[in-house]
């Protein structure tokens, strides 16, 4: 019921503002045809560096189909990898399509992904995904389709609410000082990667926008690591945990073996290692929070929590996520 109410309210809001901006000439469409209208919802966390909503200039890619992802709507070839760009109109995001999608009485199913990519050999089941060495440069890859409660999309009901989901795993760390430890310890960077010669994590892969699954490229796995260099270094001075430090990774295909994935913290210029526990499985759209204590010589795991990557009050977090 909540989803239906949300969807209905968004429709009313949209049509109430539909005259705010005309994105193209509609004089050539038939009397029983209407242009597709798009609105979006992201399941994410709040942070100044993590996207809470799409901003002006954001680009989505759409696959306009008659049901399955490879069955293009009415057989129209230009409805493959349609580019849509976000514009802000009267304080609200509107989406401009290129080319514009025209609906008739036939029902359409829309698949979406972020960020949009131009590819002459586009395959909706094989969108290139890359883990950047610099954590701040990794895109928050997303996939989505109609939200729960969505009515059939056609010329009678041309507005689609796309629910976008995260395809990567979000890994967070909070550190404090062990009980009785004194002094100031400054964290300047965090790195997550394979052990030397390891192949558990991958740095590249392909995303299936219908499922969100990523098939990793093992040829690029041994160098898979990502580093978060802190613009504002974190200082540990007592038993209070610091704000979370967050990085995204491509979910591994299986569980993590003993010592196969390691985290390296630079503290006061020295490197300290924490091995991700054995039998851990990082999944798409999940958040993993590791709480660690530092005694001046090593790191001890205090707690691990796993939650869905959903809206939450995570103010002041460090990272670069959509």
Task: Outline where the language-model segments fall.
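Sec-type signal peptide cleavage vicinity
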Residues: 2-7, 14-322
